[in-house]
Amino acid sequence: MNDMLMVIGEALIDFTPTEQGAALKDVCSFTKHCGGAPINIAAAAAKLGARSKVLTQVGADAFGDFILETLSLCQVDITAVKRTKQYPTALAFVALDEKGNRDFTFYRDPCADLHLSAEDITATMFQDCGILHFCSVDLVDSPMKYAHLKAIQLAKEQSAVISFDPNVRLPLWSSEEDCKNTILEFAPYADILKISDDELFFLTGQKDWEHIFTVFPNATIILLTCGKQGSYLMTKKHHLYEKSIPVKAIDTTGAGDAFAAAFLYQLLRDDISREQLPHLSKDILQVYLRFSNAYAADSTTKYGAVHAMATTQEFHEFLQKFHISDVFISDS
């Protein structure tokens, strides 16, 4: 049964400040958290009850140990994670403003995950792959870019759903043009595209989403997140909306990852195949969007990314607190 969520990409340590409203140079202390968008998504899906597996490489160092221990505690399959003594685990330092919005400084050139190669990716890893998710951070010119291409090929051979979140981090690219061109190169592989309003503007120069399928014609479902303005789900038949939930956000790190993970989890929970994606009803898609929107909101009420991802029980409590109903359409 192809019921595994597989993610490929960066694995790093987020150093989150213990105070808000200070510039990075003025922060006195940090707390370390397991991070990287693919890692966040695998952990969140596992916390909700899905099977998830990570394809990446970490250093043979204390930070790599911490990432693997954290993922194991979340019940994420780490059998496809490689270790290397040649390159260190990547690091990111985060500054938070008074509203929990982030500013990143990265230390990842060179780093372990960028040196996972296509030769490290094998067909046996994909035998039970139902969904493959990836982002753009590790699509810079490196061995890992070609590992992505092989992973996508192997996932497609399993008829898996391909999910892509551009997750734009411009400081990691040689130029804005290189970032944009690479994202547009990989977007056609995706059945599901999760994108923020800022990323849509960066890629298209437009904030008008009504013609989004002219830019991404191969996508079956597009998920557009707009922060406090809520979120949208678009297919070629339906345009759906959910308003934001009035939480007190303290850290938005990983909120988009929480949204994506919640959506992908529901597809796995309900055994939705790639062939079924275009035929999902408006009502079911609205439920999926409401669930994802709420799960992302909940994640902003805690510090860190993996740590902030709710378990099913924790999410039930959040839904009750905000009187959100009609979310679950089947038991986990």
For each predicted feature, which ranges?
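Glycine-rich phosphate/adenosyl-contacting loop at the front of the ribokinase-like
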Residues: 1-77, 328-332
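Conserved phosphate-binding/catalytic region of the ribokinase-like
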Residues: 1-6, 153, 208-332
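Structural motif
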Residues: 6-8, 131-133, 163, 194, ...
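Conserved N-terminal subdomain of the carbohydrate kinase-like
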Residues: 51-134, 317-332
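Glycine-rich phosphate/pyrophosphate-binding beta-alpha loops
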Residues: 90, 136-140, 296, 302-305
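Structural alpha-helical scaffold elements that stabilize or flank donor/cofactor-binding regions
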Residues: 124-125, 185-186, 215
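Alpha-helix C-terminal capping/helix-to-coil transition sites in glycosyltransferase folds
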Residues: 127-128, 188-189, 218
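Conserved beta-alpha-beta core of the PfkB/ribokinase-like small-molecule kinase fold
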Residues: 137-211, 229-230
